[in-house]
Amino acid sequence: MEQQETIHISISEAAQTHFRRLLEQQEENTNIRIFVVNPGTPNAECGVSYCPPNAVEETDTQFEYNGFSAFVDEISLPFLDEAEIDYVTDPMGSQLTLKAPNAKMRKVADDAPFIERLDYVIQTQVNPQLASHGGRVTLIEVTEDKYAILQFGGGCNGCSMVDVTLKEGIEKQLLAMFPDELAGVKDVTEHQRGEHSYY
């Protein structure tokens, strides 16, 4: 069993109170388990369940909160870094919310190769914005002159808004984050046309 300091999972006071109320009705020493199903994929789903004392594994990591602990299995662990659990009450009722920005893709180190850090930002920040249009972006390569070559898929493919979205939105966002390592972004079709412009 490990105590983990480098991975951070935030549980709000309201959510902790909610968990304590639920755990009072369970057998003694029951805690909670936080997990990710299909971690590292676009279909990743996070969940919370009861964790009876006999269900704790040697390889679990324990996070201690006020009045209970949360256990995380070793596979889910890196994908739950920076996760936030809250208990929200509104006129429609109360519900538990779980945000895990790294569930679909493991966080990369600050000193990782530029292409990995860039891909991480595209997967965790750019694609969720495009998902509402049914689109997504894939990083194909970074050229020697520091251009990121992107391929649009789904609802973005062949969409007349691609140029506007690409130039104004995504390029601006990525250049702000990587001012020294990136010169701009290009759509893969534009990049290929440029390479074969003598046809």
UniProtKB/Swiss-Prot annotation:
Pfam families reported in the protein's UniProt record? Fe-S_biosyn, NifU
The protein's matches in InterPro entries, at most eight in alphabetical order, are given as: Fe/S_biogenesis_protein_NfuA (IPR017726), FeS_biogenesis (IPR000361), FSCA_dom_sf (IPR034904), HesB-like_dom_sf (IPR035903), NIF_FeS_clus_asmbl_NifU_C (IPR001075)
Which SUPFAM superfamilies would you find in this protein's record?
A: Fe-S cluster assembly (FSCA) domain-like (SSF117916), HesB-like domain (SSF89360)
Asked if the keyword Iron-sulfur belongs to this entry, the reply reads yes
Q: How is the cofactor bound?
A: Binds 1 [4Fe-4S] cluster per subunit. The cluster is presumably bound at the interface of two monomers.
Residues engaged in binding [4Fe-4S] cluster: 156, 159
Lineage top rank: taxon: Bacteria
Keywords carried by this UniProt record: 4Fe-4S, Iron, Iron-sulfur, Metal-binding
User: What does the UniProt record say this protein does?
Assistant: Involved in iron-sulfur cluster biogenesis. Binds a 4Fe-4S cluster, can transfer this cluster to apoproteins, and thereby intervenes in the maturation of Fe/S proteins. Could also act as a scaffold/chaperone for damaged Fe/S proteins.
NCBIfam families membership: PRK11190.1, YhgI_GntY
Share what the entry says about its subunit structure, partners included. Homodimer.
The entry's protein name is Fe/S biogenesis protein NfuA
